Structures are given as C-alpha cells and as structure tokens.
C-alpha cells in the first residue's frame, strides 16, 4: 500500500478534473467507480469542508489486502498545507508554482517516490518548464503529447480548432510547445519574425534604445535595417 496526493490549481478544479478522472463524476454517485480506480477498490472517503462533492482523502483498497490512502490538495491552499507528510506518489495537474513543486519533491524524497506533472505550458517558458526542457536532471523524464497523439481528434476537428486560436497559441495548444514569455509582444509564430544570425552590412542604419525600468526590468534593444 502507498500514500499519495493529487493536486490542482484550486479545490474546485481538483474535484472537477483529478477526482473525476480517478473516481468518476463527483456529483453523481451512480457513476462512482467509473474513473481510473474501480468501485471494488474504493473505500471510505472524507469530505472537504466548504467544497460541495469534493473529497479531502479516500481509502483505496490495495491488492495485497492493505489500504492505500489518497489525499486531494490545491495550490491555492499555500505551501504550508503541502508540508510535513511522507508520500510515495504525488500527481500535480496544471503547472504548480515553484514552491509547491519543491514541496512535492521534498514530500517524496525519503521514500524514493515519484512526482508526476501533467499540464499544457499555458504560462510560457517558466522556471519549471525551462528546467525540464533545457536542463533535464538525473531521475527526471519529460514527454510531450500533441494532437497527433490523440486519435479521437480528426483532421477536420484539428483544423477547426487551429483556425479559432490566436496564431501565437497554436503550437502551444497543438504540440505542447511553450510560448516565449507569459505573453508575446508579436502575436505571430516566432519563426515568422526571426532569422539565422548574419553579419550586418556596414552601411545599414542602426538605432540603440533603452528603457530604464521603474516597476519592471530595464531593457535595451539594438536595431539595424
């Protein structure tokens, strides 16, 4: 038997996504056990105060005859609510704040446990995304999944959805590739406005500019044409 947590952005999203995927539709007891965990393995559950149909924790019957315990958490609870426990598995759905991710890693450290994260990189190249994409460390694994990995999506459906999305979001939505920054300056794919490095001809006019930050970082730019 193991001890595990599953967590999302809020108590409501944790209920509507993680609890539903694992146990079945939260507000319909007749479909309980239609998620990833079959009914015969679902034991006693405790309710989460103030959140209708949400579980705080639940007993899962293990094949050995013992009981595993699964707790449901939310990032909005703050890192203090993620402290103190020793766990075997933590599932984080949607990108967690850095302080929640480090708590999850710490909670599983003494048991050699695992931390799973499942999310679309909605926030761009964040600290967490950049580390996994550019500096994968011992014991870490990253897998991207795009629309081509979803056989239920037909080509017509893909085309319709792409047409409805802003151009700068299309790769992020369809391929799981993060946009650079939380919001792009130019709402177009990066390859349209970038080129390979080349030596700038001496006769090209040039401009340099600087913006001294007050409540934001100082920036500088060089322009040639």
Q: Where do the language-model regions lie?
A:
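Short beta-strand scaffold segments in enzyme catalytic cores
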Residues: 217-223
């Amino acid at each position: 038997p193991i001890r595990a947590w599953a967590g999302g952005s809020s108590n409501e999203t944790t209920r509507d996504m993680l609890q539903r995927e694992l146990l079945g539709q939260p507000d319909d007891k007749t479909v309980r056990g239609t998620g990833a965990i079959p009914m015969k393995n679902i034991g006693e559950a405790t309710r989460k105060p103030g959140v209708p149909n949400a579980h705080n924790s639940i007993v899962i019957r293990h094949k050995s005859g013992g009981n595993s315990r699964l707790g449901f958490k939310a990032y909005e609870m703050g890192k203090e609510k993620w402290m103190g426990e020793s766990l075997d598995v933590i599932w984080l759905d949607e990108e967690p704040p850095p302080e929640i991710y480090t708590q999850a890693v710490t909670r599983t450290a003494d048991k050699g446990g695992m931390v799973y994260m499942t999310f679309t990189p909605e926030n761009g190249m964040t600290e967490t995304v950049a580390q996994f994409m550019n500096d994968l460390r011992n014991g870490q694994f990253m897998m991207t999944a795009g629309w081509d990995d979803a056989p239920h999506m037909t080509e017509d459906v893909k085309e319709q959805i792409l047409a409805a999305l802003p151009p700068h979001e299309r790769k992020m939505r369809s391929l799981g590739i993060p946009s650079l920054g939380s919001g792009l300056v130019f709402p177009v794919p990066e390859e349209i406005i970038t080129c390979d490095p080349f030596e700038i001809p001496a006769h090209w006019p040039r401009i340099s500019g600087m913006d001294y930050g007050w409540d934001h970082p100082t920036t500088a730019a060089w322009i040639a044409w």
